[in-house]
A protein has these predicted regions:
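Juxta-kinase regulatory segment immediately upstream of eukaryotic protein kinase catalytic domains
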Residues: 2-68, 76
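Protein kinase glycine-rich loop
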Residues: 76-83, 87
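Glycine-rich ATP phosphate-binding loop
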Residues: 86-119
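The N-lobe alphaC helix and its flanking beta3-alphaC-beta4 segment of protein kinase-like domains
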Residues: 114-142
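Short beta-strand micro-motifs within the conserved protein kinase catalytic domain, predominantly
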Residues: 150-159
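Conserved short submotifs of the Hanks-type protein kinase catalytic core
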Residues: 158-172, 176
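Activation segment signature within eukaryotic-like protein kinase domains
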Residues: 191-192
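Protein kinase catalytic-loop region centered on the HRD/HxD motif
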Residues: 197-206
C-alpha cells in the first residue's frame, strides 16, 4: 500500500493561516533599471535559408543617445497567462548595421512577460511587478547560476512593462507539477536539491 497516497494536496484551516498573521513584507531593493521600448516592423535576414522576411512585432531598447541597439526580440506565440498579462516566446535578433535589412535571426530564444500598466495600477496585487524586476536584477548582479533566473532586458512603453528572460523549453516547475501530479521520490529529490541550491545562493548573496 502506498503510505503517501492520501497526501495528494496539502491543506490547512483558515484559522491556522490567520493565527500566523499576514505575510512578511518583501525585502527592499533599489529601483529596477527599465529601458524605453521601441516596437517596429522591419526586414529580417535568416542566415540558414538566406531569405529576407518582413516581420512585425520586433521590440528593442531605444537608447536616449541614439546609438543602435545590440539586439532585438521578435515576439511570437503565447506561452501562458500571467496576473497582469501574458508570457510569449521570442526569437532574439542581432543588429546588422544595414538600413535595408537591419536584423538577423539568431538561434537564441527568450520569453517575455508582457504586463499591462493599467492592470498593474488597478489590481494593486501583492505581487508587484516593479519589485519583481528590481529583485531579479539585484540577484543577477551576483553572477550567473544554472538555477537562478535573471533578466535579459526590462523595457517599458506607455502601455506595457516588458520583462525579457531566458527561454526554458520545458516550462516551469509549477506547470510540471500540475501536469504530472505527485512525483516519485527520486525525481522529487532531484528537484528539491536544486531548490535548496538556489535558496543557498540567494540567502548567501543577500
Amino acid at each position: 500500500m502506498d503510505e503517501l497516497a492520501f497526501l495528494e494536496n496539502a491543506s490547512a484551516a483558515f484559522e491556522d493561516i490567520e493565527e500566523n498573521g499576514p505575510a512578511a513584507s518583501p525585502l527592499p531593493f533599489d529601483i529596477g533599471n527599465i529601458g524605453l521600448a521601441e516596437r517596429v516592423d522591419a526586414a529580417v535576414y535568416n542566415p540558414d535559408t538566406h531569405d529576407v522576411l518582413e516581420v512585425s512585432n520586433i521590440i528593442y531598447e531605444r537608447h536616449p543617445d541614439g546609438r543602435p541597439p545590440e539586439r532585438a526580440y521578435w515576439v511570437g506565440r503565447k506561452l501562458k497567462k500571467c496576473i497582469f498579462g501574458v508570457v510569449k516566446a521570442c526569437t532574439i535578433l542581432k543588429f546588422r548595421h544595414d538600413l535595408k535589412v537591419p536584423w538577423e535571426v539568431t538561434e537564441h530564444k527568450a520569453a517575455v512577460k508582457i504586463m499591462s500598466w493599467q492592470k498593474i495600477r488597478e489590481l494593486r496585487h501583492i505581487e508587484d511587478p516593479q519589485k519583481e524586476v528590481a529583485a531579479m536584477q539585484f540577484v543577477s548582479k551576483g553572477g550567473t547560476h544554472p538555477h537562478v533566473m535573471g533578466t535579459l532586458d526590462v523595457l517599458q512603453d506607455e502601455e506595457y512593462l516588458l520583462m525579457f528572460m531566458p527561454f526554458c523549453s520545458s516550462g516551469d516547475l509549477f506547470g510540471f507539477v500540475q501536469q504530472e501530479g505527485r512525483f516519485p521520490e527520486p525525481l522529487a529529490r532531484y528537484w528539491f536539491k536544486q531548490i535548496l541550491e538556489v535558496s543557498y545562493v540567494v540567502i548567501s548573496f543577500l
